[in-house]
């Protein structure tokens, strides 16, 4: 510590460098998540959906013979596929954010920090 309870200039400069690096890495991660295509499937694989690492829907694939099923089964399959894709996407985002922050507990909204 320098005089008056302030950190020395070298420590302050290093802290700013680290903050700038985290900011750059966060932008890179944002771009990476945006370009990901994460697939979720219904249990019977009749419905597949893809969402980005940012949880944006990208596309849906439906097997032709799904239309032989009843309405409730089709709805169930769609929901299963969406839930699985969303779960994989949020897990991926949390893991990548944890990698970025080095396990720091930043208490970011939308992230469960109790895992850290």
Curated annotation (Swiss-Prot):
One of its GO terms (cellular component) is cytosol. HAMAP family: DNA_YbaB_EbfC. Keywords: Cytoplasm, DNA-binding. InterPro entries: YbaB-like_sf, YbaB/EbfC. It comes from the Bacteria. Binds to DNA and alters its conformation. May be involved in regulation of gene expression, nucleoid organization and DNA protection. This is Nucleoid-associated protein A9601_00191.
